[in-house]
């Protein structure tokens, strides 16, 4: 890509509306709007209801992803993503239905292989006040029981029902999945975010609510 002048290099659109872009101005490249998230999982690979903006701590386990590896009818090695069933583990040989073969759908003998992951930890709902292990806040689940945890950029953070926060306040974990106002104005290892507007975006059944913030978790 090579523009003759400043402006948008790439537009991200949904239903005809622009949701974000990559643009240039002089020697500056800007990504707009920016919300940075990481994939993560719970320790038991479950998928409970978690409110958007809930504070999440990293734990001492790494995320697990698996593929099945097998040969197609032409002798080529094929790898497809796979979700472990109860009792299965890496190295097991299983029967797998392959729908992409040139001869049509077929059942093949496949080996379960664990994918390499050296940098994405699993998480839990934060249960420690002023935790220094906060990884970010919950955004959404996908179909494979993986979640997105937002750690950078702009997003919402869930605040405890008994806490009143204001624009400019720094936030830290309240120890129950919600956030509270941090005492002091210095960025600490427990700092999650900074409130950007005195607006309640959503209020949940337990009285907790979300506010817009910039995230500062990594």
Where on the chain are the PLM-derived regions?
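Extracellular receptor-binding modules and their adjoining Ser/Thr/Gly/Asp/Asn-rich linkers
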Residues: 1-218
């Amino acid at each position: 890509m090579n523009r003759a002048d400043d402006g948008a290099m790439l537009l991200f659109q949904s239903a005809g509306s622009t949701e974000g872009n990559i643009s240039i101005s002089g020697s500056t490249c800007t990504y707009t709007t920016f919300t940075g998230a990481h994939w993560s999982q719970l320790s038991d690979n479950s998928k409970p209801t978690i409110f958007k903006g809930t504070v999440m701590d990293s734990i001492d386990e790494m995320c697990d992803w698996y593929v099945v590896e097998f040969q197609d009818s032409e002798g080529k090695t094929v790898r497809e993503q796979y979700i472990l069933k109860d009792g299965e583990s890496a190295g097991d040989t299983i029967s797998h239905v392959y729908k992409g073969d040139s001869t049509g759908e077929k059942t093949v003998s496949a080996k379960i292989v664990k994918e390499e992951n050296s940098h994405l930890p699993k998480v839990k709902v934060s249960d420690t006040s002023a935790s220094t292990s906060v990884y970010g806040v919950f955004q959404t689940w996908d179909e494979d029981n993986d979640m997105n945890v937002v750690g950078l950029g702009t997003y919402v953070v869930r605040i405890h029902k008994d806490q009143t926060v204001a624009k400019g306040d720094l936030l830290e974990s309240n120890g129950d999945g919600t956030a509270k106002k941090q005492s002091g104005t210095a960025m600490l290892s427990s700092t999650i975010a900074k409130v950007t507007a005195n607006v309640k975006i959503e209020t949940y059944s337990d009285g907790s609510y979300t506010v817009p913030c910039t995230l500062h978790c990594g």
